[in-house]
């Protein structure tokens, strides 16, 4: 019962993140699309389930899950081809899902078809969910990630004399240092500080990718002992999103690596969002970002395909110490 953890080939859990991301997004979208297509087949007699097309997309996805594509240990042109497959098939699945949704709406007079909505995880103190708040939420803003709900309030961005930037939306307060790291993140509902003393969220580190054997397959524990921080990092500017949010733009550079990060706090949101673009021209290196959290817990859960695995946070045994790398799909 549980995970069979092999103390080998740990790099395949995180190598080529774009392969993991594309695979998980397409898996999730396939499930949603098949559900909508099945529902359309039930509600609209004229709708024809696109079985052959979905089967073809499934076969391509399963091919890209094969060794060495999904593990990230293939050569470059293989990943380019897989990336193109993900982009093409995800776009097509969205079209199929939209067609199925429109078919359901046309067959049911009571169907309320919305094209400008998004699911916002939210539960009020009285137990009301996002469904009860749909009318109040209104349209969505897609300027950053498509899930910014309309709100009367705005995020207040304040630049201090010492270069620090404070983002405050009444629910969260983030203090961002001139180097772009988040030095404080406070939940204003309970006053809890989420960043440990003396640390910061969003500090990038380069590690040596020189395993004893099998490049792109393994990561040695020694690599973490030689981590080099990217110290040439600074805040470039602060901008406002379309719906009253605030974004801090951070630039980080070192030999062969350029990182552009956007840190966004939106109105009525309890999430501080990071969106990062990396121009990678380095070799025999890999990149990590440090996200320390002041949370008391013994274990952490990480999503994998169709489930999750747990990892010990405290390294009390040799077995715990060996689990220093983990698959992390969406959380």
Predicted regions and their residues:
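Polar, glycine-rich mid-to-C-terminal structural blocks
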Residues: 324-331
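Structured mid-domain segments that build the active-site/substrate or prosthetic-cofactor binding neighborhood
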Residues: 1-48, 264, 273-277
